[in-house]
């Protein structure tokens, strides 16, 4: 049975576009080969320049057995409280990376995330859009 979901809001699409543009700018300037943390700080700078609120290394609590637990999960970047960015600097995106961002989306009750791998020749090829019901 196919489920029908509401489309992604225009505001969320706008934030996704800003995020993709920021990743392009960072990658164009620095290229591949650096640590994730470097790309993360540079992405935060791009968001600040664009006047977009973003938080980094935001804790994701886990509700288990009716108890809110600190499981040491952290979202790389949360853009305007709505869009999750998971940044990587790996040779290849693995299924576990996609599972990670899907889990973050579910645990935080958010719909859209971007999985961005900076260790690619062309950033477009390293950017994956993940939509969660």
Model-predicted segments: where are they?
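Acidic pyrophosphate-coordinating catalytic loop
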Residues: 64-68, 123-124
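Conserved catalytic cores of phosphodiester-cleaving nucleases, focusing on short active-site segments
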Residues: 31, 54, 75-93, 104
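Short connector loops at helix/strand junctions that flank enzyme active sites
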Residues: 42, 49, 55, 70-74, ...
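A short acidic/basic microdomain associated with nuclease active sites
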Residues: 48-65
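Residues at secondary-structure transition points
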Residues: 10, 14, 34, 38, ...
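A structural signal for short, well-ordered beta-strand segments
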Residues: 58-60, 75-77, 127
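Solvent-exposed, charged helical/coil patches
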Residues: 1-53, 124, 129-133
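Nucleic-acid nuclease catalytic cores
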Residues: 88-133
């Amino acid at each position: 049975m196919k489920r029908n979901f509401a489309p992604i809001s225009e505001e969320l699409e706008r934030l996704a576009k800003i995020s993709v543009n920021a990743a392009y700018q960072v990658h164009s300037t620095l290229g591949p080969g650096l640590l994730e943390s470097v790309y993360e700080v540079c992405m935060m700078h791009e968001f600040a320049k664009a006047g977009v609120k973003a938080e980094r290394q935001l804790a994701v609590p886990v509700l288990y057995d009716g108890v809110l637990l600190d499981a040491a999960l952290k979202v790389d970047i949360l853009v305007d409280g709505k869009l999750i960015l998971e940044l990587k600097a790996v040779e290849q995106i693995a299924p576990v990376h996609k599972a990670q961002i899907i889990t973050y989306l579910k645990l935080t009750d958010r719909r859209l995330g971007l999985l961005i791998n900076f260790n690619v020749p062309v950033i477009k090829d390293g950017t994956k859009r993940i939509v969660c019901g």
